Structure formats: C-alpha cells, structure tokens
C-alpha cells in the first residue's frame, strides 16, 4: 500500500504556495518570489520568451500590469517529490479589460522544501 502520510500536508502546502504565487504576481512581491522560486526556475510566457529567475524577478519588479487575479479549477497533481498545478485564471489588465487564461506551474521538493521550477501561463490576447 502506498505511503500517503504527507499527502494532505503536501496538498495544503502547495495550495498555499499557489495562492502566494498569484498574490506575488499581483503585488510585485519579489521578496516572496525569491523564497519560492528555485534557482534554476524558468518561465515560458505568452510573449514567447523564456525567462530565467533573474529575468522573471526583474519583470515582477516592474509596475503591475494585472489586478484582481483569481484562480479557479485548481488541480494539484502530486507525483512524489514533484507536483504540477493546473488552473484557470481571471484578471483585469491595467486598462481595465477583463481577461482569462490558464497556467501550469511545476514544483519540486528540494531538501524538504517545495520550490517552483517552471511557470507556464497563457491568456487570451486582444
């Protein structure tokens, strides 16, 4: 029988980390991102660029382009020390337009701590 001792705890931790990630995007919280992103983090963004952790943090430090970010249909898939979070999101752009999209974030447990190793958001374009 598989050991499920940490499953609930891991799900709770990853649920909170997902909420922290979204709040950090909305608020430009670079400090929190420094805590939850792996050193080898990569982000594939809708502008077709692949950004490393430093480039992503620089982008997050810029003035916000999004507000009212909300996630629903959040699905967390635990695969041992690796987890994939799929979700639908809605947000408002700086000019007030409501948009929707999806994201897939990959998390890995390293030295007992969950870290985001990849982020892949996409949303409808005007």
Task: Specify the residue positions occupied by each region the protein language model found.
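A beta-strand edge to alpha-helix "cap/lid" segment located at domain peripheries
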Residues: 2-35, 40-126
């Amino acid at each position: 029988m598989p050991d499920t001792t940490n499953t609930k705890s891991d799900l709770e931790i990853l649920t909170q980390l997902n909420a922290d990630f979204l709040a950090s995007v909305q608020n430009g919280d670079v400090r929190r991102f420094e805590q939850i992103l792996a050193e080898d983090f990569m982000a594939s963004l809708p502008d077709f660029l692949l950004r490393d952790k430093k480039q992503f943090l620089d982008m997050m430090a810029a003035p916000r382009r999004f507000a009212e970010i909300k996630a629903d249909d959040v699905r967390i898939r635990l695969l041992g020390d690796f987890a994939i979070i799929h979700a639908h999101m809605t947000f408002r752009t700086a000019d007030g337009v409501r948009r929707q999209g999806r994201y897939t974030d990959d998390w890995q447990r390293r030295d007992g701590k969950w870290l985001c190793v990849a982020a892949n958001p996409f949303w409808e374009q005007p």
